[in-house]
Amino acid sequence: MSYEPTLDHLVFGAPVLAAAVDAVHALTGVRPVEGGRHVGLGTRNHLLGLGGSAYLEVIGPDPDQPEPPQPRPFGIDALTSPRLLTWAVHPPDLDAAVARARRRGQDPGPVRAMSRRTPSGELLEWRLTVPADGDGPGPGEGTGADGGAVRLLPFLIDWGSTRHPSASGLPAVPLLALSARHADPAALRAGLDALGVELSVRAGPGAELAAVLAGPSGPVVLR
């Protein structure tokens, strides 16, 4: 059996969700549509197709929910500006992919079940890995230009029997390329190899994830 994962989605986080949706619209010429609320987590999202079975998730605080008892996911509470925070890949067998990564020295974290409802009321359910928070940045982590955390190693996700979000007729902007910058490319590549994932990585200060999209007048870069 092959364990090669495929790109599932990119995560673009923001301190104010509406402003992030406007920014993506201005950059790409296409407006992300509402995805739904993550009840209890204090977030909601908008979605934009990237071609094939991949999509962009624009996520931020949900002003219609009370403050959650725990920090919002992806370090959203610490953001001062919108940016790409991390990405997700979909392996054919989530549990087998986690076991293989651990054998290779890379622990993706525990697997957790999550869900949300779409604006039409459809329940989406999935499982994903949640990287453990350590005392300092790991091989796939770093700080972005605003000092916030960036995770360059993808998390793993499995949608089970749920219809994939990309199959819901999303407006789309083709993804042309995805790359990363990290202060220790060799360590990052080792983590990617353990997950069975390929990503173009260049050396540089801090950490950054960059997606090249087919904009209305040519390629544009979302960071």
What is each residue range found by the language model?
Residues 2-7, 12-31, 50-223:
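Glyoxalase I/VOC metalloenzyme domain signal
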Residues 34, 40-53:
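N-terminal low-complexity or amphipathic/hydrophobic leaders
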Residues 39-40, 116:
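Positions that flank functional sites
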